[in-house]
Amino acid sequence: MLRKAIADIEAKYLRTDLPEMRAGDSVRVHTKIKEGDKERIQVFEGVVIAYRKGAPGSSMFTVRKVSYGVGVERMFPVHSPRIDKIEVVGHGGVRRSRLYFLRGLQGKAARLHQEEGPGAADAAHAAPTPA
């Protein structure tokens, strides 16, 4: 009874405009930042290294980027009202759900193979046709 009431209240605050994303994807997260009495949008662009799905209100994802040679990670609640929008820039071809190994890599070694568009993975593995 109480759980249903809590779920009904939480349902009002859940986002419905979420893009399909997973670990390895390059994303651009637009967050609302309040400075004094003004509010502005700040963009954080990087690679999703973890996507934790739990109860609808507790899902979170971690985005990592390297800024001026320093690795920066930021955790975002998926349904946060501070997130204005999430754009998926590219899909990374990874076989892991948590990419914490990227923390120890530098330079080109820390880059992920990017897939372009839907079905790009299928086209890459298709056998070439003889001419």
UniProtKB/Swiss-Prot annotation:
GO CC annotations, alphabetized: cytosolic large ribosomal subunit
UniProt-recorded Gene Ontology molecular function terms: structural constituent of ribosome
Keywords of this entry: Ribonucleoprotein, Ribosomal protein
Signal peptide region: none
Pfam families: Ribosomal_L19 (PF01245)
SUPFAM superfamilies given in the database record: Translation proteins SH3-like domain (SSF50104)
Ranges that cross the membrane: none
GO BP of this protein: translation
Protein family: Belongs to the bacterial ribosomal protein bL19 family.
PANTHER family: LARGE RIBOSOMAL SUBUNIT PROTEIN BL19M (PTHR15680:SF9), RIBOSOMAL PROTEIN L19 (PTHR15680)
Role: This protein is located at the 30S-50S ribosomal subunit interface and may play a role in the structure and function of the aminoacyl-tRNA binding site.
Name of this chain's protein: Large ribosomal subunit protein bL19
